[in-house]
């Protein structure tokens, strides 16, 4: 877990075997992110940035507004949770990135998203 003075990020990822097709180099992963507002004032998630790296060292950058179609406002002491997905051409990879957020005064700040692994279960001992 990574903490800033105001926000913490927790990530869990799973392999989605039912949507994957290893013979066609299609490995589907879902990840759930929990964003907790540890501060005393509301914050809002404005943009996201991801760096996705597969085990062939191929990197893809993804950026855009909000997450899953929302730019959530997170009140003090509460959390926002969402699930999204990534498709890799290899059975192993990583994701990392950051959220661009604003505080209650409209001041921007960045929250790092820790590196997390995307891996089919048989690869992890």
UniProtKB/Swiss-Prot annotation:
Gene responsible for this protein: apaG
Alphabetized Pfam families for the sequence: DUF525
Protein name: Protein ApaG
NCBIfam families: PRK05461.1
SUPFAM superfamilies linked to this entry: ApaG-like
HAMAP family: ApaG (MF_00791)
Source species of the chain: Photorhabdus laumondii subsp. laumondii (strain DSM 15139 / CIP 105565 / TT01)
Domain called ApaG: residue spans: 1-125
Xref: Gene3D superfamilies: ApaG domain
